[in-house]
Amino acid sequence: MIRVENVSKYFGERQVLKNINTEFETGKCNLIIGKSGSGKTVLMKCLVSLYTPDEGFIHFDNRVLRHLNKKEKVNLRKDIGMLFQGGALFDSMNIEENVMFPIRMFQLSDYKTMKKRVDFCLDRVNLKGINNYYPSQISGGMQKRVAIARAIATQPKYLFCDEPNSGLDPQTSIVIDQLIKEITHEYNITTVVNTHDMNSVMEIGENINYIHEGQLWWKGNSENVLTTNNQELNDFIFCSALTKRLKK
């Protein structure tokens, strides 16, 4: 579990996160949603240590992020898998090298063991046998699945996904959502997804955190998100659905 305790963040005199308190549960898909400029991306960056909160604490189970020394932060980083917006594969590396990259970076295994782990992860995302391909030789949806394989290569306890369906068609987005949800449940990972895609909210939103103007305005799940009386959230849902319809 990840617990956010009284977290605030400032850029100069502007407060972009205002006393956020929430929990991201283990074995569930925890979503951070909100309009552009709401603070959801800033919160995500605080969780993965790209930003440091000016106030408050972030707890990774029994580890408090602010209190960790350099070695302890490296050990925590080994427990974190990242799925970046767009996938962020290395074009100069083949698929096997891309998936193997985080294992090599943390020197977690010998080559034979790493190779076995890569094969397992690619098989898990239904991409068996593409080890020697390069990212430019496969589709965008396949690239995203490779990115998921890379994210789970180190057997993480925590998985962070930043707009995982960005640039994907609706059918491929459903596949990616289902894969993230399956992996979360199968490996009992604490998964945090930053998204504005309402299809993702309905498909995998087991613990939804709606951020508005830097504050946590609503918390719930996909079963009650459409019946809430929160006007700001209702406006967000309507605008998201309208935007998606206009893009078709």
Language model segments and positions:
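Helix-to-loop junction immediately C-terminal to a conserved catalytic motif
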Residues: 48
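Conserved ABC transporter NBD signature motif
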Residues: 56-64
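Conserved ABC ATPase signature
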Residues: 134-138, 142
